[in-house]
Amino acid sequence: MAAAPATLALDPQPQEKQKDASESSELSRLRAELAGALAEMETMKAVAEVSESTKAEAVAAVQRQCQEEVASLQAILKDSISSYETQIAALKQERQQQQQDFEEKDRELGHLKQLLARAHPLDSLEKQMEKAHEDSEKLREIVLPMEQEITELKGKLQRAEELIQEIQRRPRQPASLHGSTELLPLSRNPSPPLEPLEEPSGDAGPAAEAFAHNCDDSASISSFSLGGAAGSASLRGPQGLSPEQEETASLVSTGTLVPEGIFLPPPGYQLVPDSQWEQLQVEGRQLQKELESVSRERDELQEGLRRSNEDCAKQMQVLLAQVQNSEQLLRTLQGTVSQAQERVQLQMAELATSHKCLSQEVKRLNEENQGLRAEQLPSSALQGSEQREDQDEALPSSIQELHLLVQNTRQQARARQQAQEHEAERLRIEIVKLREALDEETAAKASLERQLRVQREETDVLEASLCSLRIETERVQQEQRKAQLTDLLSEQRAKTLRLQAELETSEQVQRDFVRLSQALQVRLERIRQAETLQQVRSILDEAPLRDIRDIKDS
C-alpha cells in the first residue's frame, strides 16, 4: 500500500519534463522561425535599398541623357539657324553684286555707243551729201533756164528757116521778101538772146559760170546767124539769092546743130563712152551677182541671227522659268525651315515641360523614398529595441503569446514585403515610362536630324542650280549685247559706205558737168574766133558733145 502512492507521486515529474521538453522544442522552433523571418526582413530591406539606389541611378541617368539630348538639339538648332542666316546674307550680297554688275554693264554699253558715234562721224558725211545735193540743185536751176533758152532759140531758128524757104520759093517778089526779112529783127527784138541769169552762189563754183557763158555764146551765135541772114536778104532781096546767101542760109540751117548737139543728161545720170558703158554693164552684172551672193549671205546671216535670237529668247525664258522655280523652291525651303524651327521650338517647349514634369516626379520619388527610409528607420529601430527588450526580457511565458508574436511578426513581414513589391512595381513602371519617353525623344531627334540633313542637301542643290543659272544668264546677256553691237557696227559701216558712194557719185557728176561746160565753151569760142563760114561749118560738123567720151576723144 505504501509503494503505490510513491509511484503515484513520481509520475507527474516525467510528464512535466516531457511538457517542458515539448515547449522548449516548440520555442526553439519558433525562435528559428523568428530568426528566419528577421533574416528575410533584412534581406527585403537590402533589396529595397538596392532597388532605391538602382531607381535613383536610373532616374539620374535618364535626367542626364535628357539634358544631353536637349543641349545637343539646342546646339544643332543654333548651328542651323546661324548657317541659314549666313546663307541668306550671302544671297542678299550676291544679289546686290549682280545689280551692281548690271548697272556697270549698262554704263559700259552707253560708253561704247558714245565711242561708236564718235568713231563714225556720220554727221559730216551727211552734211557733205546735203551740200552735194544743194550743188546739184543749183546746177539744175542753172541748166533748166539754159534748156528753155535753147528751146526758144530752136524755135527762132525754125521760124528763120521757114522764112528762108518762103523767100526761096518766091524769089520774084521783092516787096514780100523785104517784108519777111523785116520780120526777123521784129521777131528777134521782143525776146533778147539771153536774159541775165541769177548769179550763182559760191557753192556752185566754176560750173555755173561755164554754163552761163556757154548759154550766152550759143545765144550770140543764133542771133548772129539770124542777123546775117536777115541783112543779106534785105540787101539783095530784089536781085534774088546769091551763092553767099545760100551759104548763109545753109549756115543758119546747120546752126541748129549747135543746140541739138548738146546733150544734157538728166539729174542723177553720168555721161560715159560706149566701151566704158559696156565695161560698166559687165561690172554691173558682176556686181549684181556679187550683190545677190552678198544678199543671200546676208539673208542667211539674218536667218541665223534670227534663229540665234529665238534660241536665246527661248533659253532666256527657260532660264527665267528655272530661276522662278528655284526662287519658289527657295521660298518653299525657307517656309519649311521656318516650320521646322517652329516644330523644333514646340518640341523644345514640350521637352522642357516633360523635363520639368520628370524633375518634379523625381523630386516626388525622392521625397517618397526619403519618407519610406524615415519610416523604415523608426520601424527598424523599434524592432531592434523590441528585440533587445525581448532579448533582455524573458521570453513569453506561454505558447499562446509566442504564437501571437510570431503571427504578428509574420503579418508585419508580409505587409512590408507587399509594400516593397508595390514600390518595386511602381518604380519599374516609372522606369519603363521614362525609357519610352527617352526613346520617343531620341526618335524625334533622329527625325529632326534627317529633315535637317535633307534640307541642307536641297539647299546645296538649289544653290548650285541657281549659280549655274546665273552664269548662263550672264553668258546669254553678253552674247545678246555682242550681237547688238555687231549689228549696229555693220549698219553704221554700210551707211558710211553708202554715203561715201553717193558723195563720190555727186562729185563725179559735178566734174562731168564742169568738163562738158568747158568743152562747149571752147567750141563756142572757136566758132566766135572763126573768120570764115567754112571754118564755122567745119566746127559745127564736128562730133556732137553728147557725153564725156566725146570730150575725152576730142
Swiss-Prot record:
Gene3D superfamilies: 1.20.5.340, Single helix bin. Residues 14-28 have a biased composition (Basic and acidic residues). Residues 15-173, 274-509 form a coiled coil. GO terms for cellular component: centrosome; ciliary basal body; cytosol; early endosome; Golgi apparatus. GO terms for molecular function: growth factor activity; GTPase activator activity. It is found in: Cytoplasm; Early endosome; Cytoplasm, Cytoskeleton, Microtubule organizing center, Centrosome; Cytoplasm, Cytoskeleton, Cilium basal body. Residues 1-28, 167-208, 371-395 are annotated as: Disordered. The modification Phosphoserine is found at residues 176, 180, 187, 191. It comes from the Eukaryota. GO terms for biological process: cell projection organization; endocytosis; protein transport; regulation of cilium assembly. Keywords: Cell projection, Cilium biogenesis/degradation, Coiled coil, Cytoplasm, Cytoskeleton, Endocytosis, Endosome, Phosphoprotein, Protein transport, Transport. SUPFAM superfamilies: G protein-binding domain (SSF103652). Belongs to the rabaptin family. Heterodimer with RABGEF1. The dimer binds RAB5A that has been activated by GTP-binding. Interacts with SDCCAG8; this interaction is important for ciliogenesis regulation. Interacts with RAB4A; this interaction may mediate VEGFR2 cell surface expression. Plays a role in membrane trafficking and in homotypic early endosome fusion. Participates in arteriogenesis by regulating vascular endothelial growth factor receptor 2/VEGFR2 cell surface expression and endosomal trafficking. By interacting with SDCCAG8, localizes to centrosomes and plays a critical role in ciliogenesis. This is Rab GTPase-binding effector protein 2.
